[in-house]
Amino acid sequence: MRYSKPPLNIPDQLQQLRDRGLLVRSDDLALNALELIGYYRLSAYWLFFEEPPAPGETRSHRFKPGSSFEQVIELYNRDRLIRLLVIDAIERIEIAARSAWVQEMSMKHGPHCYLDPLLFRSDFNHGEQLEQLRSQLQQSNETFVIHYRQTYSEPELPPIWAMTELISLGTLRAWIAATELDSKTKVARSLGMPSAQVLNGVLHSLNLLRNISAHHGRLWNRLIVKRLPKIKKLQNLLVLEDVDGEGVQPSKMLYNYLVLMAIIVRKVAPLSTWPSRMGVVMSEMGPEQQGAMGCPVGWQQQQIWS
């Protein structure tokens, strides 16, 4: 079937929402939001307020009685707050993982240890990784990069503690995963994770969340592509589900990832108020909106949110 829906101007977009039963108390607010946020982006949030579709349909395009544009904007803003808090937590976790890996590797193998391919798995493509670092260095105007170039003739690349300031979370995860077991296990335990394998899965999941958040994507009411690894000591805190062929696994709904972030943040930044701030944002949502994130009944009583 060929797509044939015509574009609508903003006043017509608002009228279409009214025709479908959405209450609009302030035309100015609604028109401004449609102009600055966009009809399509907001539609992911007002879908929650629509009547269930009839059999054979994907959407009803009719709003539940009492649903308002203001409720849609409130939900949109809650998701934005969650996204900002997620970026905050991942920043802390990424920096802690980076610092732990740098300290472990440099103390054991020296400041330029990452240049030695023998310290990493044979399937890591070490040479390709170094080429990517060289390319980043050539394009960088960071003060520490310029200083190293102007001051030292060799090695060509800066020490590990400088190099890691240039790499992404995804690249950091790859380097840690390629490290020998004893060292990466110590990194995992510094973040409160039981094993290097679990840490790798956690960093993979958090990297996906970081990318969604950095591109301003919706987190609320979304299934995260990468399922969290099973972490035995957290099973009473996570929401679990039966997965065909895999047994009981953590749900892919957002709540589980927020639980994990709260636990790691408590480990790497004990004085942080992040868990309680996230708990406040979630508690200000209605029960159905919390359920759409995967929040279990009674989640507020969990000590991690206090």
Predicted regions and their residues:
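Acidic/aromatic/glycine-rich contiguous surface patches that form carbohydrate-binding/processing clefts
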Residues: 216
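Extended intrinsically disordered or low-complexity regions, especially N/C-terminal cytosolic tails and loops
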Residues: 1-208, 220-306
